[in-house]
């Protein structure tokens, strides 16, 4: 099967930068130039100059450079792309594609992975993207999940890495990056029966490792948000010492998380993930239709979720509650990433509410431990003990309220889940 992998250049000043990069790696290639333009409704359009490189010695792989603009919602966006088209069934083609990607990403130019089709890129920017429009989409093939659904999650992660590394460890960006990494890992877990188990497990480990890098920053952000609420409720002097300590801790955690991180390094890792997805030898499960695989896989996850209260009955055991939250979060991410299953907004809202309530309980549990550790670390700051007591009291009140309504919320969620299963599975 022919696959495409697109590297979108950031801050590329001239087309010659892209052309020279490719020419150095393919000096014997024949180059043909063509201008492409297409117009859409609402005055959207794209226009670009495309250079196609072809080599007789490697007919299974072609490279093209595109330079131009997209006009979307009256905004001009640059097109500065290097796209590789290769036969994923030919090992030599995949190996050569990986070699070229590594060489491109070792240059001074910065790249992110992007959707190769400019038309679909415009749809995505307008918020009307439909995965069924992708050429690789096939309702009769379960592997459509690998070629259509997973790549878009990869693109989101890569673009957020670009924003984080350009703008710094801003709280909203760090949170979004962590969420997108978790969503990518959840969808990969969902698709795991289609893939070689050992390699899929290794990629799960890699994505978990990347997510965990951001964990300390997230913990500090949660604590600082609670401190901000305390100040709003009780005045600017509330939790003053605790806030100062946490801000320093947050700076240190962010520096540690981003130390040594380079955009092209992240892009290369994610490009390798895509190349593996495109070329992996699939299991027998891939012979199912997409609908049958989705029914089977979501049915299996449904069966596991419905027995969670029996498996983890102790509402006061925060480790058990955390395990429930992880499974609910993974389920919600899969539902959101696969529109074919038609998850109703009510179900998604209920899932999110359950996840937030369980998250509040777990945050309270973790925060109490962190606050205790800070008090022990700074015994000479007398105000800290008072502020920590005020902090934990504030958090505990919210946790107690969440714990009280949790059984009722689970009943509501369970009803919605049953209804969804009856309609969709």
Map each language-model feature to its residues.
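Function-determining surface determinants
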Residues: 1-425
């Amino acid at each position: 099967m022919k696959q495409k992998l697109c590297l979108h250049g950031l801050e590329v000043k001239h087309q010659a930068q892209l052309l020279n990069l490719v020419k150095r790696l393919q000096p014997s290639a024949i180059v043909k130039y063509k201008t492409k333009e297409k117009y859409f409704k609402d005055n959207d359009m794209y226009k670009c100059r495309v250079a196609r490189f072809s080599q007789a010695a490697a007919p299974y792989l072609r490279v093209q450079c595109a330079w131009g603009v997209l006009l979307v919602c009256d905004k001009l966006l640059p097109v500065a792309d290097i796209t590789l088209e290769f036969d994923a069934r030919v090992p030599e083609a995949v190996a050569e594609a990986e070699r070229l990607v590594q060489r491109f990403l070792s240059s001074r130019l910065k790249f992110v992975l992007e959707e190769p089709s400019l038309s679909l890129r415009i749809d995505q920017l307008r918020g009307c993207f439909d995965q069924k429009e992708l050429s690789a989409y096939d309702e009769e093939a379960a592997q459509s999940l690998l070629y259509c659904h997973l790549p878009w999650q990869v693109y989101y992660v890569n673009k957020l890495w670009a924003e984080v590394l350009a703008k710094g460890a801003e709280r909203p960006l760090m949170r979004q990056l962590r969420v997108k990494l978790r969503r990518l890992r959840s969808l990969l877990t969902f698709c795991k029966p289609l893939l070689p188990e050992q390699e899929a497990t290794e990629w799960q480990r890699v994505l978990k490792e990347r997510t965990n890098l951001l964990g300390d920053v997230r913990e500090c952000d949660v604590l600082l948000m609670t401190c901000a609420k305390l100040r709003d409720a009780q005045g600017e002097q509330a939790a003053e010492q605790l806030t100062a300590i946490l801000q320093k801790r947050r700076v240190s955690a962010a520096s540690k998380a981003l130390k040594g991180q380079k955009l092209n390094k992240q892009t290369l890792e994610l490009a390798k993930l895509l190349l593996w997805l495109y070329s992996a030898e699939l299991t027998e499960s891939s012979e199912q239709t997409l609908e049958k695989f989705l029914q089977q896989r979501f049915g299996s996850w449904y069966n596991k979720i419905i027995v969670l209260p029996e498996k983890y009955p102790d509402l006061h055991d925060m480790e058990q509650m955390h395990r429930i939250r992880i499974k609910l979060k993974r389920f919600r991410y899969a539902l959101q990433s696969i529109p074919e299953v038609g998850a109703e907004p009510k179900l998604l809202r209920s899932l999110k509410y359950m996840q937030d309530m369980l998250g509040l309980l777990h945050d309270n549990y973790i925060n109490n431990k962190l606050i205790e550790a800070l008090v022990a670390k700074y015994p000479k700051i007398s105000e800290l003990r008072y502020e920590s007591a005020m902090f934990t009291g504030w958090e505990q009140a919210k946790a107690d309220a969440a714990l009280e309504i949790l059984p009722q919320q689970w009943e509501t969620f369970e009803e919605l889940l049953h209804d969804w299963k009856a309609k969709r599975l």
